[in-house]
């Protein structure tokens, strides 16, 4: 075991969530209830998973907190921004994800979490009509106001550290443009000239977070930190960034099931994925411009697992389609349908059907906990820039596409990356030995 330079998790950890909707309030409520011993954080890898460290007679399986210094749940303080002014208790009740018995015991704590005014541009989320928004003339003004919010929150709550995580709606698609997104100088210039076409509000949150010494996590498929200019800023500020798009349901299944097809060298003719969703996320995604952002994210999984360049006979002509349908009666209870057309020996066709009846926010909440705790850990370990070891939590993991890097989407390879990062930060050797 090697000596490490990971700083201890001393003092309070502020978690500032962009968005105070179903996902955010389910996350907050679960953490607060867990602290009181009234529920368990099921689904959280940082709270439940064990990793093997050592080999032979020295082999043992330890929880993450016994390998690396994770922040304690009792030390977490929540803050949030939202376009709607309702406090976290009101928002949790409105979301109808959790039952009253799971909200009322922490009512006072949730009521104390009041959203700050959001940096918002309705052109990026046309289905939202909240008025709890900042009056900013330019994108740069948004950055300055958000920086002040982080400074004030940190001071007011006595936080040693703050992590900012996006759990708000998907913005309309902003394609990467080398003329605006390549360098930090370009990004600064675009923000200060109020270039609203190329600078999304989410970029202002990321910029403010990084410049205030806070790791930033993009939980939606927004472009935001997935551009070289933001990587440069993360390097300059020595802060971790992670993204994008929480991997909760259908894509989680896809990233775990596609490796089965690949491992057995079965052919894949097509994969049709659709789901129905009735919460505010579904409402926003009913807008074509916003759905396109999500579509790009969800379509990226298969091609890096079942590779046409490696096995053209098996994967050279895959038809991959993804659809999301807004269906209000289901609210947060998302249902995913997958039809997978495969072929085997001598080209004979077969089919696989998957029907996943899930709860969107219940699956997402533990990801917020894990991503924030591990990003805070990464910052204290001196890790900055893109945190590829967090890919297991994300639909479209960030990678340096300017250097020809490809995302790792295979769930089992992602798990190895996560375990090895924890091992290394804990002073143990990384390895790929089968557990």
Feature locations, PLM:
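Metallocofactor- and cofactor-centric catalytic cores in central/energy metabolism, strongly enriched
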Residues: 1-220, 224-236, 250-258, 351-435
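Short flexible/disordered coil segments
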Residues: 222-237, 275-287, 304-313, 331-344, ...
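Glycine-rich, aromatic-lined ligand/substrate-binding cores of catalytic
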Residues: 297-386
